């Protein structure tokens, strides 16, 4: 070959060499020094620049479950140039989040997280130090206290029961009105406002603006939040996407800005009526702690209250709305299950009084139905991403500090090693042999609210709320769809997975008042 031909090929050779060096550097950069006796987590080879973005696809819970079947409970992928460790298997996840909880309690510093309450959210903030832990306990205790505390002027056992009973009965009336007017309804639009009113009353008491246009706009657009705070969101791993036209990201920013402004306004208005000798809601309790902060260096400066209320509101809103919506659609899909719940309610509660939280132990089939909703739909497919706080190891694999961690809850709930026929909807799997109680061993295998030090602070109130809403709705109503209408149970991926829209649900009164 002539020298001139070599010269003409030089640009191509230089380009090929540059690409090779870049890929080699990226591979080397993604590898870490592994201590003796440990290994790097296994995983498939990714593509240059994008890593495993195409492999993860639009349904990461499914694609990463398939990869776990090939590579095991601890595997590693790359999204862009960022390494991500994916954990599957109940025992492996418990080992990481519970037994080694301090190692895995961090949050990755993701771009989408910085947009939530201006990057100061207790739930999404990378901070995991002692001040974060103390504020988390405070928020958890406040939420729990105003769930179980009782109003001496009320017949209800606690504030939560009082608020849910009121809203559930109002929802029954709304659904009957929709039936009288158009003969059918779409569940989400009916349920979302009622659930928001419950957590709003818990947070703000009588100061919550139930019917304000501002509040309704926020709750009806909450999907703009859950669609963006997801495991595998490309904008978190490819910075260039933040500067390109991105309607979903724009809606996400707008939602967060509007929500913070709404909470700031409501908190400020509530402060005008604050009486430290009459604490009747969560925000009042936080005001009192804020005053203690000024007096003796407590945990909550006043500016942090909005951030904490934001986390509490979020913990008690979207999960409950999604659970009730899925429940209604699965009830119309499996009418025999609905019939068994009706029979249990008629036997235990009857029709002369309203269901109460104290009825839970006597309504095991309803409880089993709810557990199967959580397991079968796995509508929180991943926890909010974790990160490691220090170099650690798991199952013989080295995981360095600040490694992003995905927890695949969907895989746990559909693991054939844990569940017989995991893709069949069967509430009976959670009952003891005589069907008289919940099988605790089975119920503890369901993952929906995370585990360990980042477990959802609203788990207990959310479970109580879902139970009482469904008990009251099903005491009064029978849900169905017209003959020939098929319900779409295909979930739409997000932080919480929503079912497809169904505008033809019907609710018929079971008895005359």
UniProtKB/Swiss-Prot annotation:
Belongs to the cytochrome P450 family. Substrate binds at residue 225. GO terms for cellular component: endoplasmic reticulum membrane. Pathway: Cofactor metabolism; retinol metabolism; Steroid metabolism; cholesterol metabolism; Lipid metabolism; arachidonate metabolism. PROSITE patterns: CYTOCHROME_P450. A cytochrome P450 monooxygenase involved in the metabolism of various endogenous substrates, including fatty acids, steroid hormones and vitamins. Mechanistically, uses molecular oxygen inserting one oxygen atom into a substrate, and reducing the second into a water molecule, with two electrons provided by NADPH via cytochrome P450 reductase (NADPH--hemoprotein reductase). Catalyzes the hydroxylation of carbon-hydrogen bonds. Exhibits high catalytic activity for the formation of hydroxyestrogens from estrone (E1) and 17beta-estradiol (E2), namely 2-hydroxy E1 and E2. It is a peripheral membrane protein. Glycans are attached at residue 68. SUPFAM superfamilies: Cytochrome P450. The keyword Heme applies. It catalyses: an organic molecule + reduced [NADPH--hemoprotein reductase] + O2 = an alcohol + oxidized [NADPH--hemoprotein reductase] + H2O + H(+); 17beta-estradiol + reduced [NADPH--hemoprotein reductase] + O2 = 2-hydroxy-17beta-estradiol + oxidized [NADPH--hemoprotein reductase] + H2O + H(+); 17beta-estradiol + reduced [NADPH--hemoprotein reductase] + O2 = 4-hydroxy-17beta-estradiol + oxidized [NADPH--hemoprotein reductase] + H2O + H(+); estrone + reduced [NADPH--hemoprotein reductase] + O2 = 2-hydroxyestrone + oxidized [NADPH--hemoprotein reductase] + H2O + H(+). This is Cytochrome P450 1A2. It comes from Mus musculus (Mouse). GO terms for molecular function: caffeine oxidase activity; demethylase activity; enzyme binding; estrogen 16-alpha-hydroxylase activity; estrogen 2-hydroxylase activity; heme binding; hydroperoxy icosatetraenoate dehydratase activity; iron ion binding. Its EC number is 1.14.14.1, 4.2.1.152. It is found in: Endoplasmic reticulum membrane; Microsome membrane. GO terms for biological process: alkaloid metabolic process; arachidonate metabolic process; cellular respiration; cellular response to cadmium ion; cholesterol metabolic process; dibenzo-p-dioxin metabolic process; estrogen metabolic process; hydrogen peroxide biosynthetic process. Keywords: Endoplasmic reticulum, Fatty acid metabolism, Glycoprotein, Heme, Iron, Lipid metabolism, Lyase, Membrane, Metal-binding, Microsome, Monooxygenase, Oxidoreductase, Steroid metabolism, Sterol metabolism. Interacts with PGRMC1; the interaction requires PGRMC1 homodimerization. It holds the Pfam family p450. Heme binds at residue 456. The keyword RNA-binding does not apply. Induction: By 3-methylcholanthrene (3MC). InterPro entries: Cyt_P450, Cyt_P450_CS, Cyt_P450_E_grp-I, Cyt_P450_E_grp-I_CYP1, Cyt_P450_sf.
């Amino acid at each position: 070959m002539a020298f001139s031909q070599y010269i003409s090929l030089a640009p191509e050779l230089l380009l090929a060499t540059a690409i090779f060096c870049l890929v080699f550097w990226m591979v080397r950069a993604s590898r870490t020094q592994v201590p003796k006796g440990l290994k790097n987590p296994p995983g498939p080879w990714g593509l240059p620049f994008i890593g495993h973005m195409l492999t993860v696809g639009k349904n990461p819970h499914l694609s990463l479950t398939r990869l776990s079947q090939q590579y095991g409970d601890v595997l590693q992928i790359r999204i862009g140039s960022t390494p991500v460790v994916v954990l599957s298997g109940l025992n492996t996840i418990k080992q990481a989040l519970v037994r080694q909880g301090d190692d895995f309690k961090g949050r990755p510093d993701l771009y989408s997280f910085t947009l939530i309450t201006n990057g100061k959210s207790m739930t999404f903030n990378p901070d995991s130090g002692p001040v974060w832990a103390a504020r988390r306990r405070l928020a958890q205790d406040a939420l729990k206290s105003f769930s179980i505390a009782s109003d001496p002027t009320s017949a209800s056992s606690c504030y939560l029961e009082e608020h849910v009973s009121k809203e559930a009965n109002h929802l029954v009336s709304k659904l009957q009105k929709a039936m009288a007017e158009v003969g059918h309804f779409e569940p989400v639009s009916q349920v979302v406002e009622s659930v928001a009113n419950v957590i709003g009353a818990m947070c703000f008491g009588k100061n919550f603006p139930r019917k304000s246009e501002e509040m309704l706009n926020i709750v009806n657009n909450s999907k703009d939040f859950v669609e963006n705070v997801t495991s595998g969101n490309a904008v978190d791993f490819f910075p260039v996407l933040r500067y390109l036209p991105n309607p979903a990201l724009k809606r996400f920013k707008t939602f967060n800005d509007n929500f913070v402004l709404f909470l700031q306004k409501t908190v400020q208005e509530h402060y005008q009526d604050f009486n430290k000798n009459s604490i009747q809601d969560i925000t009042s309790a936080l005001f009192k702690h804020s005053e203690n902060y000024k007096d003796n260096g407590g945990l909550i400066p006043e500016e942090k209250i909005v951030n904490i209320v934001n986390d509490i509101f979020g913990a008690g809103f979207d999960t409950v709305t999604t659970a009730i919506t899925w429940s209604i659609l699965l009830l119309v899909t499996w009418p025999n299950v609905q019939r068994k719940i009706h029979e249990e309610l008629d036997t235990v509660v009857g029709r002369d009084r309203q269901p109460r939280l104290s009825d839970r132990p006597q309504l095991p089939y309803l409880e089993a139905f709810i557990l199967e909703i959580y397991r079968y739909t796995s509508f929180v497919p991943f926890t909010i991403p974790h990160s490691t706080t220090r170099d650690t190891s798991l199952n013989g694999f080295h995981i360095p500090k600040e490694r992003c961690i995905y927890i695949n809850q969907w895989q746990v709930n559909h693991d054939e090693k844990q569940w017989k026929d995991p893709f069949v909807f069967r509430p009976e799997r959670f009952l003891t042999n005589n069907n008289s109680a919940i099988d605790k061993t089975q119920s503890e295998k369901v993952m929906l609210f995370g585990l360990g030090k980042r477990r959802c602070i609203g788990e207990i109130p959310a479970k109580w709320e879902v139970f009482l809403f469904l008990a009251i709705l099903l005491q009064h109503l029978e849900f169905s769809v017209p003959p020939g209408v098929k319900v779409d149970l295909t979930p739409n991926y997000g932080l919480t997975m929503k079912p497809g829209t169904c505008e033809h649900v019907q609710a018929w009164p079971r008895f005359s008042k």
